Amino acid sequence: MPVEDHFPEPLVFNPASGIHKHTVILLHGRGGSADAFGPALLNTALPVAGTAISTQQDGPHGRRRTLGEDNGVSTDASAAPSVCDGASAKLYNHISPITLAQALPHARFVFPTAPKQRATVYKRSIIRQWFDDWHLGFVDDKVDSRYDLGLQTTELVSTVEYLYRLIAEEARLVGDTRKVILGGISQGCVASLVASLLWKGEEELGGVVGMCGWLPYISQMRAQLVGRDGQESRDTTWGEDLEEGAGFDPFERSASPDCDMDLPGGIDGKGSVKSALEWLRGELDILETQSGSSDVLRSSVPAILCHGQDDDKVDIAKASESAEFLPALGLEPLRFKEYAGVGHEFSSEILSDIAVFIQDVLGEPSI
């Protein structure tokens, strides 16, 4: 049960340009708050003078902020960023440091704060979290081979419905839901992914941003895409080629491992995809209060998932599994990026990638 029965007022930063064209909603992780997460993220300097991100196994990763399930404690580490050719480099023509807010001058940034709840994993200690859950060492939403029996469901429902109210208000202010970006770190990423999958407004979201997160209920939704005999359903794109050990590697590195990679996916299997999403909606008992027909399959929504290879709280395997599965549910094209030397945190390079992604999906010119 929540200790607080309401969501605190979000922390809002108006556009640096004074002109509101887009809104970016970003959720903190468990134990954090908007007051700690928002300013730290917006005050982090992005790489400069033609530099861009690198995902090399042995590459340094610049200034980092640890802001996940850590009560908002931050740590910094300085190193020179690496250079990557390709689309990611287009943002960085400036010669002095800029921030995410300056890179997206027409964006209004909204940082919600989760209510205080009792956390099962912390012996029911009171902490801010978007939903309750078991320790992430367990997989497939199971504990001791048992389904989690809805432990995370109640608060996750409240969070998703709250996010829908925020999205609707920001869409009203900016004039179009497609100008709203939703995302977060850790638990905030989870809530954003679920909310984006179940959103049934007349217009789709502009995009989804995830850091250090994962998609819950994958095994249950995959069961809706694959027949009971384990073979490919006739109306789904998920089949033997995507089964474990089939020899297909959706994360196979290209000749330039530093740069973006769009993952395969699709929503050709409309019946099964709809079944998977309706299972998730039914599990969370979220009513279709938004306008739009449940008989019409959602359109694609672009997304980016960023994850540190040294994350000791959310294993990168959970993120890569999520990145493999999400395009089949309509989050595509999806960019999945790994960062050597980065833990359960965001870094300047992660924020650089996010800035480029948002510029791409919103059609904003680089500065």
Residues covered by each model-derived region:
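Fungal eukaryote-biased detector of long internal structured cores
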Residues: 1-2, 12, 17, 172-177, ...
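Serine-hydrolase catalytic machinery in alpha/beta-hydrolase-like enzymes
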Residues: 5-12, 22-179
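The feature captures the conserved acid-bearing segment of alpha/beta-hydrolase catalytic domains
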Residues: 12-18, 207, 213-364
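Short, well-ordered alpha-helices that flank and scaffold nucleotide-derived cofactor binding pockets
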Residues: 39-46, 197-201, 324, 328
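Gly/Ala-rich beta-loop-alpha elbow adjacent to hydrolase catalytic centers
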Residues: 183-188, 192
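Conserved hydrolase catalytic core segment
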Residues: 194-206, 215-216
